Amino acid sequence: LVGSEMCIRDSENFIGCDSSYRAASIVLYGAPYDSTTSYRPGARFGPAAIRHESYGLETYSPYQNADLTDFDIFDSGDLELCFGSSESALADIEARAEEILQDGKFPLLLGGEHLVTLGAVRAAVKKYPDLHIVHFDAHADLRDDYLGAKLSHACVLRRCHELVGDGRIHQFCIRSGDRAEFEFAAQHTEMHKFD
């Protein structure tokens, strides 16, 4: 067995992800984490729920004339993340993305709260220093800190900006945030507000 095929799958696979790790060009993995959620916890159940609900979809898109089964995708299951430490969870997410990238494959992450993005971006920017981020959300997530924490779902794009720099975060459908977030976005990101 290839090392990554030894992952224990504690949930069903996403529909159409039938490839082996060795043959895959895309590796899907889950980051069930929601320790900094401030409104309603439960995002940690997201990866399993997304996989479960994927079986209500079809693999073929007539709009794209493409089928998920046209791609070699391996679902490696969910990471076991430490809920007591955001930095530890981010390090695990980053390490998994780094392993996938080093194997010449594309990592595809299912979250979890928004903070999980930072771990994957940390890995991706090492391989792709000119990385751009496309962010669809109702909230800007550009606070410098939230409730005294710099590692929070409300700060994740601010931390990503520290890695990728100005003009490389493209935000769409943003409808709320505090004044400082919108002022920061005007200077540092490409924000397209919700209309």
Predicted regions mapped to residue ranges:
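Short, small-residue-biased leader/transition segments that mark boundaries at the very start
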Residues: 1-7
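Conserved alpha-helical scaffold segments that buttress catalytic/binding sites
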Residues: 9-195
